Amino acid sequence: MPEFYDVVHTRVRDGAEEEMLSRRPALEAGVRQKLPGLLDIRLVRLDDGTYLDVLRWESREAADAAIELFAEVPEAGEIHGFLPAGIAHHRGEVAGG
């Protein structure tokens, strides 16, 4: 099975960036612990000040199962609390591999 990715493109709420970055390692650790099949999380800051949150899963099935668990993971909710309403969420698998 090819690895699967969730990629979220967003801004951070005004005035929340510093707190988000300081809380992020602990929040990521909680998410990793509670969502089976999650291989990696990377936060990428783009030149325009927006962020890509890239989650790498062992499979599409693991990513789909996580959707059901996401609401039960307090750390995931806290991460989303730093974001405004408008996010772009993309999903897909590794091509050619």
Name each model feature, range by range.
Residues F4-R11, L52:
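Active-site-flanking beta-strand signature of metal-NTP-handling nucleotidyl enzymes
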Residues R11-S22:
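Short, surface-exposed ligand-recognition loops at beta-strand->loop->(often short) alpha-helix junctions
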Residues A26, G30-L39, R56-H90:
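An amphipathic, aromatic/His-enriched active-site/gating alpha helix that lines ligand/cofactor pockets
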Residues D40, Y51-L52:
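Amphipathic, hydrophobic secondary-structure cores in small proteins
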Residues R91-G97:
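Short, low-order "capping/linker" segments at domain edges
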